[in-house]
Curated annotation (Swiss-Prot):
GO molecular function, one term: GTP binding
Subunit and partners: Monomer. Associates with 30S ribosomal subunit, binds 16S rRNA.
Upper lineage: Bacteria, Pseudomonadati, Pseudomonadota, Gammaproteobacteria, Pseudomonadales
EC number: 3.6.1.-
Binding of Zn(2+), residues: C299, C304, H306, C312
CDD domains: YjeQ_EngC (cd01854)
InterPro entries: G_CP_dom (IPR030378), NA-bd_OB-fold (IPR012340), P-loop_NTPase (IPR027417), Ribosome_biogen_GTPase_RsgA (IPR004881), RsgA_GTPase_dom (IPR010914)
Domain CP-type G: 116-275
Protein name: Small ribosomal subunit biogenesis GTPase RsgA
Amino acid sequence: MAKRQLNRRQNWRIEKIQNERAARAAKREQHALQELEGGDLGPEQLGLVIAHFGVQVEVEAQDGEFAGQVFRCHLRANLPALVTGDRVVWRAGNQGIGVIVAQMPRSTELCRPNNHGQLKPVAANVDLIVIVFAPAPEPHPNLIDRYLVAAEHAGIRPLLLLNKADLINDENGPALHALLEVYRDLGYPLLEVSAHHGDGMQRLQQMLDGHISVFVGQSGVGKSSLVNSLLPAADTRVGDLSEWSGQGTHTTTTARLYHFPNGGDLIDSPGIREFGLGHVSRDDVEDGFIEFRDLFGTCRFRDCKHDREPGCALLEALEDGRIKQQRMNSYRSIIASLPEDSY
């Protein structure tokens, strides 16, 4: 059945109701915060945001008498938006409730535009972004390259992870191996695992230890299954592939940080089908294609669009095999998707 289209008045009414609900929730939160701060609060101490629930977050105490304990915390109104992975200064209150009073500087942040095109951080202080894909749903090089550009732009080291390796067969194997070979030749770290059978999981754990990692990738590639295999106590819900669309059903609804036994953390974030890059410039995209970097600026024409122009360094590199057609297609697609003012 086709989805019913709403008229302008209906959309306005829905937005009005949502804004009113948000205002009431904010008012209740402010009242609770005032009551909390009116009582006895403990000293300032360091904490780590391990989950975010709208107007409240879960904070794990990093020092002091409460080290290792988790508190549900209110946010002071003057704080910037916090995300999982943020380091904060907080004060403990009564009944396991606390107040966050300051945000510590971030070493990195992973951002994506929201539905309104506004830039929104989704994880903080991450130093390893694990790009997960699988034989099914069919991996899209363009999406993988978007994640790689985002990782390069954020200064976060990427790891390409092929999950469900047990599903590789004679039919999909040649295309998958050709896909992997492109990234292997570029020097990107790459690992094949099966969360279901356990193949390669010990090696994955070793590569994650000592890092703050985040798993990204389209729904249905097994991110939740990977978390359950690495951390059985996490009990992340798993969704099956939709039989109708072949795409994954979204399962994880809240970004949460988990600790590995041997050190390091993992942030499990909601599944993303399309990762927007509207917040990056053309220069950022060009820098994100690592094998293209030395070629930009060497074309015959300064305003070369790398399409059909004579003397184009990218086209010459494409012709002699120094860059792959797959990557060239992704580059053109990503550049075409940027807002005009990004040029």
